[in-house]
A protein has these predicted regions:
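An aromatic/glycine/proline-enriched structural segment found at the starts
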Residues: 149-207, 303, 310, 314-320
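His/Glu-based metal-binding/catalytic segments typifying zinc-dependent metallopeptidases
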Residues: 177-242, 273, 322
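Extracytoplasmic
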Residues: 1-5, 23, 30, 41-45, ...
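Solvent-exposed coil/turn segments that connect beta secondary-structure elements
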Residues: 17-18, 51-53, 92, 153-157, ...
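M16/insulysin-pitrilysin zinc metalloprotease superfamily fold
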Residues: 16, 48-83, 245, 261-321
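M16/MPP (pitrilysin/insulinase) zinc-metallopeptidase core fold and M16-derived inactive scaffolds
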Residues: 1-52, 96-101, 117-123, 233-268
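Histidine-acidic residue clusters that define the catalytic metal-binding segment
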Residues: 49, 56, 107-148, 158, ...
Length: 322
């Protein structure tokens, strides 16, 4: 198992690299750049914001930094030891009720698939057992051009930047013996899965109804944008259904939310979360299920649908014009 190695490598990426031998953090902070990185179940993302596009030196440095993250991270033993202590403290701080809840419901969210036991940060024992060689091997195995993507967003000349991306990143050699990346499958369940979480530190009583859906395979740009717009429209319209109950003072819950978003690679998730009034757990559940079923069978009112589209367009229009 390589649990925790992707997250460990994310930490290493902010230490020494080929073009930033004194550390990436020093450069980013000295130039007041906003940066972030996150490792999830399927991928690691690095992000730098507020890069002044009029400053050619800054943009050139960021291109080299992105290239270094792809292929030029220096994995030094002294940095491994330092980051192991930092990650270990991160692990200890994460051992709270929210973490216990996440781990408890994972077998039901992912139906006992490999995702159910996947531990992004790893165990404390694993964190301190990994060596520079282990991390370097992981880096060489999985940080390959065909598994990477570079996105540059801003007021730029696309043709020039595309040329630079091809020049800089095209120099990264392909792996001679690439390991196949296998996508874990989440099996269908014949009946709904149920889990009740009880914890002495859990002070709120909440309920979640989650439904997995297969995502589009090899989506086009149009597919991705279309799905995002549909998800936002669905969330807006479904939320209005919940709001109507509150306006009529007929709701059996304190608060309720609905969302449609990516779950893991190849799967999306429709989630209904609500906090019922004390003693109204079953009534609230029946009420949410009734709304969910009505939407599934009848859809939305055509007038409300057009109003939602117009409202979403008006929200997005300033962004498109800026």
């Amino acid at each position: 198992k390589q649990y925790g190695l992707a997250h460990f490598l994310e930490h290493m990426a902010f230490n020494a690299t080929e073009h930033f031998p004194h550390g990436v953090m020093t450069y980013l902070r000295d130039h007041s750049l906003v940066f972030n990185a996150q490792t999830g179940i399927n991928e690691t993302r690095f992000q730098v914001n507020n890069v002044p596009v009029a400053d050619s030196e800054a943009t050139a440095s960021m291109m080299l930094l992105l290239k270094d993250w792809c292929n030029g991270i220096k994995i030094l033993p002294k940095d491994v030891e330092k980051e192991a202590n930092i990650i270990s403290e991160e692990w200890r701080q994460s051992r709270n009720v929210n973490k216990r809840l996440t781990e408890a419901i994972a077998p039901y969210i992912y139906n006992h698939s490999d995702y159910a036991t996947h531990n992004v940060i790893g165990s404390e024992k694993q964190i301190h057992s990994y060596t520079a060689k282990d991390i370097k091997t992981f880096y060489q195995q999985w940080y390959r051009p065909e598994l990477q993507c570079v996105a540059i967003i801003g007021d730029i000349e696309p043709t020039e930047y595309e040329k630079e991306v091809k020049r800089i990143f095209g120099a990264i050699p392909a792996s001679k013996k690439p390991i196949t990346r296998e996508n874990a499958l989440v099996p269908e369940n014949d009946t709904p899965l149920y889990y009740r979480f009880i914890d002495k530190e859990n002070t709120s009583n909440s309920v979640g109804i989650y439904q997995r859906n297969l995502a589009i395979t090899d989506p086009t740009k149009r597919d991705v944008v279309g799905d995002q717009l549909k998800a936002r429209l669905f969330q807006r319209l479904a939320s209005q259904e919940l709001a109507m109950l509150r306006n009529d003072a007929k709701e059996e819950f304190i608060t309720a939310t609905v969302s449609y978003s990516p779950l893991v690679r190849q799967y999306d998730q429709n989630a209904w979360d609500f906090v019922p009034y004390a003693g109204k757990e079953q009534a609230a559940l029946k009420q949410i299920l009734a709304i969910r079923e009505r939407i599934y069978r009848q859809g939305f009112d055509s007038e409300e649908f057009e109003q939602a589209k117009e409202a979403l367009y008006n929200e997005m229009k300033p962004l498109m014009e800026s």
